[in-house]
Amino acid sequence: MYKSPLTLLTLLTICFGFFDLSSALYGSSSPVVQLTASNFKSKVLNSNGVVLVEFFAPWCGHCKALTPTWEKVANILKGVATVAAIDADAHQSAAQDYGIKGFPTIKVFVPGKAPIDYQGARDAKSIANFAYKQIKGLLSDRLEGKSKPTGGGSKEKKSEPSASVELNASNFDDLVIESNELWIVEFFAPWCGHCKKLAPEWKRAAKNLQGKVKLGHVNCDVEQSIMSRFKVQGFPTILVFGPDKSSPYPYEGARSASAIESFASELVESSAGPVEVTELTGPDVMEKKCGSAAICFISFLPDILDSKAEGRNKYLEMLLSVAEKFKKQPYSFMWVAAVTQMDLEKRVNVGGYGYPAMVAMNVKKGVYAPLKSAFELQHLLEFVKDAGTGGKGNVPMNGTPEIVKTKEWDGKDGELIEEDEFSLDELMGGDDAVGSKDEL
């Protein structure tokens, strides 16, 4: 069958045009920086400034629609921030490192922090405004001395802690997750100034804690899958892997060898001692039990006239069971009788839905999370476990609660205070008095 040369030429043009479009969305003259798996580290991770990265697929319709907008953003931010793009089809390893599931995905890389997902509107103004906020935050951190330029280029740590175990994707589960030992793990980035400052302290702590507590470190530039797995958001992050290895919690103490050693030693000692649920009887008790605890769990128990001693003791036995389950975690458990600490109840919104109730508090951060299910053993265990992973949603306390001094419970049933009866006539002065007043 005869085919017109023009028709064949048209078909070839369409085919080759299609393959050309599928190879890339941004040409050599585009203001958007072209990324590959080989230059990603130098262009993005080692950058001293904010970098916006679009992960795209050439066949993706939404990616094609975003192309002119992304180039407009690149022109707007020229000289202020880097706007880049990477073909996730051609460079799948880079996409896998950041858990890319759909296209286009936009991530913003800020020095010293984990990448941030951009989930706003896909117009140039919205994207540029979001970038501006990140740039402003970076400048603010540098002015306050929290972040410093890296000088361009990622450098490996000159001296790895000799007693700290180097952890990676191939050995992390075997050494940490499957272990019965306590592990304290530092997640760092080689270019991070705060990480470099911590390095000698970490080395000293690891050496002094040998045989007592395991210390390890993860290079997040290399082991990004581990970083994502434990939701590491900044560097350095120190996580404590206690008995429940699936729910590590952050170390929030000072970044000195002595502080880390003291924390680890106290953790080991507390795991061996008896558990306790302390009655909150004043500000000194609050400071002692909640001041240094990662999470402070406070239970608000019914008035003794409502539960009697037998009922209250049952609640306390239940709380002791919960405390025993989490004895190796840096938690504290306290209880307080209903309406004895009114300012605390007000700030954590307890009382309106009855007693008993429980809240998880982080005093340092000034936040809390309420127990929303029944005050029963299984629900309490689940609540404490979830609170340890940040899965309960924190609510601000809006200020430090005022704790008042109260008497410690004597372990007995309460006594109903009977009030003296009075006569309405006596209150009003009696009939004679009323009559006399009327006569006047």
From Swiss-Prot:
Site entry (Lowers pKa of C-terminal Cys of first active site), positions: 122
Site (Lowers pKa of C-terminal Cys of second active site): 255
Catalytic activity: Catalyzes the rearrangement of -S-S- bonds in proteins
A GO molecular-function annotation: protein disulfide isomerase activity
InterPro entries in the record: PDI_thioredoxin-like_dom, Thioredoxin-like_sf, Thioredoxin_CS, Thioredoxin_domain
Induction line: By chemically-induced ER stress response.
Disulfide pattern: 60-63, 192-195
Pfam families linked: Thioredox_PDIA6_C, Thioredoxin
Annotated catalytic residues: 60 (nucleophile), 63 (nucleophile), 192 (nucleophile), 195 (nucleophile)
PANTHER family cross-referenced by the UniProt entry: PROTEIN DISULFIDE-ISOMERASE A6
Protein family (similarity comment): Belongs to the protein disulfide isomerase family.
Protein name as it appears in the record: Protein disulfide-isomerase 2-3
